């Protein structure tokens, strides 16, 4: 663990040095105000990021955490795209330098040069040092400015998209065992709301209003509701009491609940009128609905128990499983689940995060089939860390179950 920490720290510091070199040192004069300002910014901003990644900062009132979290997490997103853009710019940099050098040589050539009899041609000198230096500074400013503009534009777009709220997706999923009487049953799936100092009560209210507007038969809240303690976020989650569905609202824990006393949060959710499925199931018209605790709960003796949630049931009935992480799909297949509903991945949240999540999750987003079991993974409604989504817009999915007997 110490080795991993040191490796991450070295990469973090090294990449910030690279950004400082390309954006500050290579584009400003030594001792100038822009260089001093840029240097200070590239010390303060990563410091705020390190503070932001810690939940419930000791000694800082919860309402003030957002003052740290907003710039800290936004810088983390900007930093990601600045690095990517600068790395891409390394390929452009030598091309620009050569093009400018050729242009300067052509400008320096005399229009007419009458030959001198008996005079030896003057040796060709390299470009004067001042001219070469000027070209390098110009190219550094073009590449650095472009990288900064791309990063800021990308993060600005991704932040605005998240704050507008999740999109509504609609998907029809056929289940062979579903009776005709349950054909068209609609489940509103929402995951990864991540209420926090950044996304508070207003965001929760918007999510609730969006869900209710779909008029679902059932609501499934598939984990990672909060990023904070009950004391700090009880007001933020209050709008969930307004969720309305004909067959009720159900909840399973995500890994983030276990960072903040999952047992207490389950109690809060129950008081709000949702039905926690803690390794349990309930019979609904036409199918069984089961839920398991998140695998993170294993460290506290509260891990998933598939035998308890899915054992001793009628295998002729269709079954839907709520499980926060897609990685439990093998257990779902083993227990004959027809449809598993999950979240956790955020669809990658920040491109190219989808590629990284694909290394550790069977499905990053959308619907897949594993044997006789279908797995749907929501991209989630909120965001963890940077309040930004790029290439993975947030969603609330309305799944309409279709009977194979219809």
Which residues does each PLM region occupy?
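Non-catalytic terminal accessory segments
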Residues: 1-163
């Amino acid at each position: 663990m110490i080795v991993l920490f040191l490796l991450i720290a070295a990469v973090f510091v090294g990449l910030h040095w690279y950004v400082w070199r390309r954006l500050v040192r290579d584009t400003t004069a030594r001792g100038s105000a822009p260089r001093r300002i840029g240097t200070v910014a590239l010390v303060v901003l990563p410091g705020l990021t390190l503070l932001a990644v810690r939940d419930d900062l000791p000694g800082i009132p919860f309402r003030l955490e957002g003052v740290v979290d907003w710039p800290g997490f936004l810088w983390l997103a900007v930093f990601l795209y600045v690095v990517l853009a600068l790395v891409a710019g390394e390929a452009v940099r030598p091309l620009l330098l050569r093009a400018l050098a050729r242009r300067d040589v052509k400008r320096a050539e005399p229009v007419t040069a009458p030959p001198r009899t008996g005079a030896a041609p003057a040796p060709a000198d390299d470009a004067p040092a001042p001219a070469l230096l000027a070209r390098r500074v110009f190219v550094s400013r073009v590449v650095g400015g472009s990288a900064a503009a791309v990063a800021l534009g990308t993060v600005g777009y991704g932040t605005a998209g998240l704050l507008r709220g999740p999109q509504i997706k609609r998907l029809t999923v056929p289940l062979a065992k579903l009776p005709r009487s349950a054909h068209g049953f609609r489940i509103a799936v929402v995951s990864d709301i991540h209420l926090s100092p950044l996304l508070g009560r207003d965001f929760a209210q918007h999510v609730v209003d969006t869900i209710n507007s779909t008029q679902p038969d059932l609501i499934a809240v598939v984990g990672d509701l909060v990023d904070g303690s009950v004391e700090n976020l009880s007001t933020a989650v209050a709008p969930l009491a307004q969720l309305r569905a004909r067959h009720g609202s159900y909840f399973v824990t995500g890994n983030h609940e276990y960072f903040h006393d999952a047992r207490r949060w389950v109690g809060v959710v129950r008081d709000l009128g949702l039905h926690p499925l803690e390794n349990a199931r309930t019979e609904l018209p036409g199918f069984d609905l089961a839920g398991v605790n998140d695998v993170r709960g294993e460290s506290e003796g509260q891990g998933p128990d598939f035998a308890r949630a899915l054992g001793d049931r009628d295998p002729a009935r269709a079954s839907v499983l709520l499980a926060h992480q897609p990685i439990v799909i093998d257990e779902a297949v083993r227990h004959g689940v027809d449809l598993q509903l999950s979240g956790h991945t955020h669809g990658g949240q920040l491109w190219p995060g989808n590629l990284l999540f694909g290394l550790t999750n069977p499905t990053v987003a959308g619907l897949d089939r594993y044997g006789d079991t279908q797995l749907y993974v929501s991209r989630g409604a909120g965001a963890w860390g940077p309040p930004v989504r790029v290439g993975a817009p947030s969603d609330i999915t309305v799944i309409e179950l279709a009977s194979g007997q219809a």
